């Protein structure tokens, strides 16, 4: 559910971007709808609304959501202020690389890798497995950042599609791979769990 909520602003961004550019009159003022800049405005507005509602309901936002929101506001505002999509193209790479830095830093700061802090309440795994899993996420974030950067500046006509659906596809593939990897190790901890319940 959380992943779907996080995807809403990006989906609205995509819909507006794909809309044929046209002038729309709102309260006597004329605005252009469609294209990268109106889509960027929609991304900013929808992100503020979505995460604002989440904050009011939960009284907090996760750190990853704060990072996503701040990055959206910063890079989106720069895109509109300078009328240059270059800033927006850097958003996904920077966010992914910041996640990679955070996951890498958790090996040296704190008592557990970040992935264990996120999933540890649901899974019992050896420390070595948690370390490998965390490293896998670091590599994944680095790869996603590099892929987004490459596509954004190499395939101008394709980068928005990749930003929305390519990143989602890579994430789903990675999660499936993670599930397969974890399934090979969960049975190692199952007997211990059963004994403790007895």
UniProtKB/Swiss-Prot annotation:
InterPro entries: YciB (IPR006008)
The protein's name: Inner membrane-spanning protein YciB
Function summary: Plays a role in cell envelope biogenesis, maintenance of cell envelope integrity and membrane homeostasis.
Transmembrane segments: 36-56, 67-87, 90-110, 133-153, 162-182
Xref: PANTHER family: INNER MEMBRANE-SPANNING PROTEIN YCIB, INTRACELLULAR SEPTATION PROTEIN A-RELATED
Superkingdom of origin organism: Bacteria
Record's keyword terms, sorted: Cell inner membrane, Cell membrane, Membrane, Transmembrane, Transmembrane helix
Disulfide bonds: none
Family (UniProt): Belongs to the YciB family.
Bilayer topology annotation: Multi-pass membrane protein
Compartment annotation: Cell inner membrane
GO cellular component term of the entry, any: plasma membrane
Originating species: Pseudomonas savastanoi pv. phaseolicola (strain 1448A / Race 6)
